């Protein structure tokens, strides 16, 4: 019960991309027995949880769900979007314009916040962010650990500034009257 009183925990999750099955029904019930005050989400099976969720929907789909007339469970949460591999996350404003137009959405979670790598050094002392096969092993199938909006040392990447602007607390719109 370490984190049950944390104000930072607003939703419990059954996991990420782990498939369906009876174990998730049992896990949902165990979480509700443990803490019935917070909703539970799981993007692989919205039938067994308290709120709707999915990953990487299109902007058009989000706009439709924002009407409150979609065949989904509300409130709705995008559990994974804006994968920031390379130069990505440029259409966040389109997602958030739709989500903020309604009370049917309760947010979305960026994948990933920070690149997953560690300080690594060449034999001559040059420091770089190392991951996966950089350490002599090959347990991975690609560069799926350097897709955050922050570098491993927490310095911002270009995507960070897009997110900061879109997530700002105040919205300003120019009207015809200036």
Each model region followed by its residue ranges:
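Surface beta-strand/loop "capping" patches
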Residues: 154-178
